[in-house]
Amino acid sequence: MEHFLKKAKASASELLRIDGAKKKSVLLQIADDIEKNSNKILAANEKDMALAREMNLSSALIDRLFLDEKRVRSMAESVREIAMLKDPVGRVLDGWVLDNGLRIEKVSIPIGVIGIIYESRPNVTSDAAALCFKSGNVSILKGGKEAKNSNEAIAETIQAVLEKNDLPKELVSLLPDYSREGVEKLIKMDKYVDLIIPRGGEGLIRYVSENATVPVVKHDKGLCHTYIDKDADFDKAVAIAVNAKVQRPGVCNAMETLLVDYAIKDEILLKLYEAFKPHMTTLKGCALTKEVLPDIETASEEDFHTEYLENILSIKVVDGVEEAIEHIRKYGSGHSEAIVTENYTTAEKFMNEVDAACVYVNASTRFTDGGVFGFGAEVGISTNKLHARGPMGINDLTTYKYKIYGEGQIRQ
C-alpha cells in the first residue's frame, strides 16, 4: 500500500507541468475512448450485475451499479463537459499591494492527492478521475467490490489514454485492496494523501470520519424533506413531491420525508395519495396523517431517521413552518430540503433558517447535482461546512497559495 501511494504522490508533480489546453485534450480523448470501449465496459458490468443478483443486493444498489449503452454515453459526455470547463488552477482569487510595494496574489492550486471512497456507482470512477485531473489532482479511487470489474474496465481505459500522452498512469489509480483493511490503511496515510472524500452508507461515513488522520470531506446520507405549506399551490406541490420521491428513489437527493401543514392536511393528503398510487410507493404516516389516510402504514420514530433509498415515503403533519423547520433540524442530514409555498415571507424564513447544503423553494430536491448546477459533474455532495459544501465541482478540488512579489523589500 505504501509503495503504491508513494508512486501516486510522486506523479502529482507531472500535473503541475501541464497546462489547461493539454488537460482538456487528454480528457476529450478519455471521453472518446470510454465510448469506443463501451462493449468492454458493459461486459465487465454484466459480470458485476450477475454477482449482485447472486448476493441479493437491494434494488437501489443494483440500480446504481447497472450500466447500459445510454449510461456509458452519459459517462463519456460528462467527461467532455468537464474537459470544456475553465481550468480552475491558477485563478487569481484576490490581490492587493501593500504600502511598502509588496504585491500579493491569492492563487488557486491543486489540493494534491485525493482519495475517493465510494460504493456501487461505476460512473463515479470516470467522473472523479476527470474532475481530479482537470483540477490538477491525483486520484486514488476506492470503489465498492460489487463494481470491481466495471471500475477496472473504466480505469484501464483512462490509464491507457494517460500513457499514450506520456503521462504516468498513477495519476488515476484504483486502490488495489478492496477490503475494509484497505480503507483503514488509506485513510491513515496522511504522508501521501491530502484529502479523503467518502461517499456511501452511513456506516462507511462514520467509520472514515472517526478513524481518518487524513482530512475528510463527507458525502453523507441524504435524508431530504419537502414541506408543503398552507399557502402552497396544490398542483405544484403534488408534482414536486412525486418527482422528489419516485423519479429515482435510490439516490441521495431523493425525498425521504414529506411534511404537510396541518391547515391543509385533509385536502392535500388525499391528492398526494392518488398521485403516488400509480407509482406503488409505500406510504408511512404519523397519527394525524392516518386520520386522513387510514390504510397506509404507521410511521415509527425510526422511520423519520431513515434514508430509505427505496420507493418508500414517510409523511408527517406539522403545525406550520416553525414545526417543519424544527423537524428538519432534528432529523435532517444537511443535504437538501425544500418548501412549496406561494408566501414570500414563509419561503424566506425557511430558506434562512434551514441548515442544509441546498435549500429549495418550489422545486424538487432532485436538482442537487453537480451536472445540473453547471459544474460538469461532481465528486460528491458535501454535507460538511468546511472546506466545501453541496455539490463539489472542480473549483472545490482546489486550495490556494499566496504569491508575494517584491523588489528587494526587507522587514524593519
UniProtKB/Swiss-Prot annotation:
What GO cellular component entries does it have?
cytoplasm
Give the reaction(s) catalysed.
Answer: L-glutamate 5-semialdehyde + phosphate + NADP(+) = L-glutamyl 5-phosphate + NADPH + H(+)
The main place the protein resides is: cytoplasm
Q: Has UniProt tagged this entry with the keyword NADP? A: yes
One family from Pfam that matches here is Aldedh
State the EC number(s).
Answer: 1.2.1.41
The record's section on InterPro entries has: Ald_DH/histidinol_DH, Ald_DH_C, Ald_DH_N, Aldehyde_DH_dom, G-glutamylP_reductase_CS, Glu-5-SA_DH, GPR_dom
Compartments where located = Cytoplasm
Signal peptide annotation: none
- Assigned protein family: Belongs to the gamma-glutamyl phosphate reductase family.
Record's protein name: Gamma-glutamyl phosphate reductase
Q: Which gene encodes it?
A: proA
